[in-house]
């Protein structure tokens, strides 16, 4: 029941911004039901093909190169493996060559459909401009896929149903949750950090957790009795003494 135009635009920016090389980039969309998935892929694919790719400092460029040749090879290797595993390569970004930058580390926007949970393109963090579409047949199945994933940094639900949004936000085992927000990075006075394999250290970064990280706790236990009495105290009660 999501606004499809909004969901498609959100996926574009969240998946392909910074060439997908950021910890909060989305790498998978769980489109509930085949009709929803068909409409989503049909609307998204031409936008991915139309991405303007080049040097980041060139006017109008929407996506630049990945960081190293090794990253380019690794990302294209994931696309290769996804295709071998049975995913539909709807938009293929492999082998992209730009005039004047033939040796550049460019990978075009890639869209994979009919991905399944056992595929490495879904299980692993690719850190590249690759978006996988899975097709769970119900809300419960989609939520369970998120719950079962190894990583738990961020997730989002796109819906007009407030009950579904509330259920998702309260029950999901993910550190940062968006409701109709594709990249749920909170403002600085809230904590930033994931759960499960996406957790780092024992505190999150921002908010009160950040203050705690830079705080060394000290406990002081004191009494100011009315008069000093002799004798040992054998319990923790401040008002009881045994002489």
Which role fits each region the language model picked out?
Residues 1-116, 145, 179, 226-230, ...:
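ALDH superfamily catalytic-core signature
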Residues 126:
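Cofactor-binding beta-sheet edge motifs in enzyme active sites
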Residues 129:
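Glycine-rich nucleotide-phosphate-binding loops and adjacent flexible coil segments
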Residues 40, 94-113, 139-228:
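C-terminal core of ALDH-fold dehydrogenases
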Residues 68, 132-137, 158:
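A structural signal for short, well-ordered beta-strand elements
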Residues 122:
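Short, solvent-exposed loop/beta-turn-alpha elements that line the ligand-binding surface or hinge
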Residues 82, 133, 155:
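A short acidic/histidine/glycine-rich donor-binding loop in glycosyltransferase catalytic cores
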């Amino acid at each position: 029941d999501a606004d499809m135009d909004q969901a498609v635009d959100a996926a574009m920016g969240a998946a392909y911004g910074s060439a997908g090389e950021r910890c909060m980039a989305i790498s998978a969309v769980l489109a509930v039901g085949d009709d929803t998935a068909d409409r989503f892929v049909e609307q998204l694919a031409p936008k991915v093909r139309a991405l303007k790719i080049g040097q980041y400092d060139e006017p109008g460029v929407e996506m630049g190169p990945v960081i190293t040749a090794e990253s380019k090879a690794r990302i294209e290797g994931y696309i290769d493996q996804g295709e071998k595993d049975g995913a539909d390569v709807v938009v293929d970004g492999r082998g992209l060559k730009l005039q004047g930058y033939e040796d550049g580390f460019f990978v075009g926007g890639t869209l994979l459909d009919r991905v399944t949970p056992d595929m490495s393109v879904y299980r692993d963090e690719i850190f590249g401009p690759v978006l996988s579409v899975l097709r769970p047949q119900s809300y419960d199945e989609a939520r369970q896929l998120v719950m079962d994933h190894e990583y738990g940094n961020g997730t989002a639900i796109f819906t007009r149903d407030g009950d579904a949004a509330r259920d998702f936000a309260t029950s999901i085992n993910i550190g940062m949750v968006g409701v109709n927000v594709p990249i749920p990075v909170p403002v600085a006075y809230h904590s930033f950090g994931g759960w499960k394999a996406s957790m780092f250290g024992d505190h999150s970064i921002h908010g009160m957790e950040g203050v705690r990280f830079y705080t060394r706790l000290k406990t002081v236990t004191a009494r100011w009795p009315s008069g000093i009495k002799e004798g040992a105290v054998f319990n923790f009660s401040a008002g009881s003494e045994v002489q």
